[in-house]
Amino acid sequence: MVDIKISGRKVSISEALHTHVDQKIGDALKVFDITPMSCDVVLRVDKNPSNPDRKTAEVTVFVRNNVVRVTASSDDMYVAIDEAAEKVSRQLRKYKTKVVERR
């Protein structure tokens, strides 16, 4: 299992958020038989009141010869993390099929 580095910008990372990120992003990384080199998760809260989706989760996964980067925003941090996990899963599926087709 790859170590997931979690950092927060303008937000403190609680134990519940840390557990949720480990569970959701970790499960998305385990689904496909891909061993990423590293994974970085940045959770950010924007202070702009006119932006309804102020909470953002950015996930960067470094795999061999490729980088998968997704961003998801929502008004709830947990929803943003869930959306980012779905996007990572979709991108890794595309990467996996591309690698298999080129063999």
Label each PLM-derived region with a short phrase.
Residues 1-103:
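N-terminal, polar/charged subdomain of small-to-medium soluble alpha/beta proteins
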